[in-house]
């Protein structure tokens, strides 16, 4: 099986349209990358943590018996995005799996974190450097929801705290919490590949001994066996499962424990907040690029 990558370099205000366009044409995934080697610094109020120039990459799966007409696809894209630079490349499976290593650079998240590919040296040795090899699991710091969660963790007192990372993906949030002093992190994801990636990334950062990660059923058994409740919970998934999980999260977090939810777009904030207000005090709603939002607050004093 082969893969086709279409790389389109656009301005910040064209990202949403370009991403939607690529997905509507059958892309199996879309990624965003810095086009001009800019640091992703902590934004001022009203600003967004997205680069001015962005490479939007659509990934298409090619069937050997029905190959994609690349020129026809590019012609259509160029009609929708006139005078916009774009290029394509076709990758075999083995090359595609690690192709991003050729151009992946450290990413600065605010002023506290650097996300550093495992094969590169950290740009700032004294910063909180998260070594990462996400493979195909979600969560590299590029996406707005991951940024919002990292930003929140960086401002939260995690010293000697018990933390839950629900929907851990690559493990980036679990690792960040441990590097910031969490006593223990319990992480879970429905994807076995994410569980493996989280273990590998925790090992890369020398924090594996303070991490438990498993599929949800395994996680539930392990966490209940611990006899504790979490001081902090972070969940970067989607609005629908977040609303379904609200009663369960209320049992996992101790009274006055802190939480942050992401993977929510602006239009979903009211619905999610309404469900969570039954169990939690909503203290802050933070909005970032392309309408992605974070809801944070504390568990009610009485369980």
Swiss-Prot record:
One of its GO terms (cellular component) is cytosol. It catalyses: L-lysyl-[protein] + 3 S-adenosyl-L-methionine = N(6),N(6),N(6)-trimethyl-L-lysyl-[protein] + 3 S-adenosyl-L-homocysteine + 3 H(+). One of its GO terms (biological process) is methylation. GO terms for molecular function: protein-lysine N-methyltransferase activity. Its main location: cytoplasm. Its EC number is 2.1.1.-. InterPro entries: Ribosomal_L11_MeTrfase_PrmA (IPR050078), Ribosomal_PrmA_MeTrfase (IPR004498), SAM-dependent_MTases_sf (IPR029063). Signal peptide: none annotated. Keywords: Cytoplasm, Methyltransferase, S-adenosyl-L-methionine, Transferase. S-adenosyl-L-methionine binds at residues 146, 167, 189, 236. It is found in: Cytoplasm. Methylates ribosomal protein L11. Belongs to the methyltransferase superfamily. PrmA family. This is Ribosomal protein L11 methyltransferase. It comes from Acinetobacter baylyi (strain ATCC 33305 / BD413 / ADP1).
């Amino acid at each position: 099986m082969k893969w086709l990558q279409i790389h389109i370099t656009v301005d910040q205000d064209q990202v949403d349209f370009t991403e939607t366009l690529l997905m509507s044409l059958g892309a199996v995934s879309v990624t965003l990358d810095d086009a001009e080697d800019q640091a992703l610094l902590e934004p001022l109020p009203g600003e967004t943590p997205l680069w001015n120039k962005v490479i939007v990459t659509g990934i298409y799966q090619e069937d050997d018996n029905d190959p994609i007409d690349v020129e026809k696809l590019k012609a259509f894209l160029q009609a929708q995005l006139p005078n916009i630079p774009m290029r394509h490349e076709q990758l075999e499976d083995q090359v595609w799996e690690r192709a991003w290593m050729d151009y992946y650079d450290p990413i600065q998240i605010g002023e506290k974190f650097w996300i550093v590919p495992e094969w590169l040296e950290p740009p700032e040795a004294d910063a909180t450097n998260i070594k990462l090899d996400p493979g195909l699991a979600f969560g590299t710091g590029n996406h707005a929801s991951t940024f919002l969660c990292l930003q929140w963790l960086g401002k939260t007192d995690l010293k000697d705290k018990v933390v839950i990372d629900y929907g851990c993906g690559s493990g980036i949030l679990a690792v960040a919490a441990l590097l910031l002093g969490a006593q223990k992190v319990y992480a879970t994801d429905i994807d076995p590949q994410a569980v493996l990636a989280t273990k590998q990334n925790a090992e890369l950062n020398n924090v594996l001994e303070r991490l438990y990660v498993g599929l949800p059923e395994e996680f539930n058994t392990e966490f209940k066996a611990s006899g504790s409740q979490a001081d902090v919970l972070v969940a970067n998934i989607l609005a629908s499962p977040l609303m379904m999980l609200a009663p369960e999260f209320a049992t996992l977090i101790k009274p006055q424990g802190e939480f942050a939810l992401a993977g929510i777009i602006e239009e979903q904030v009211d619905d999610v907040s309404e469900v969570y207000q039954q169990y939690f005090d909503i203290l802050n709603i933070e909005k970032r690029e392309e309408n992605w939002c974070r809801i944070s607050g504390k568990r009610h004093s009485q369980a």
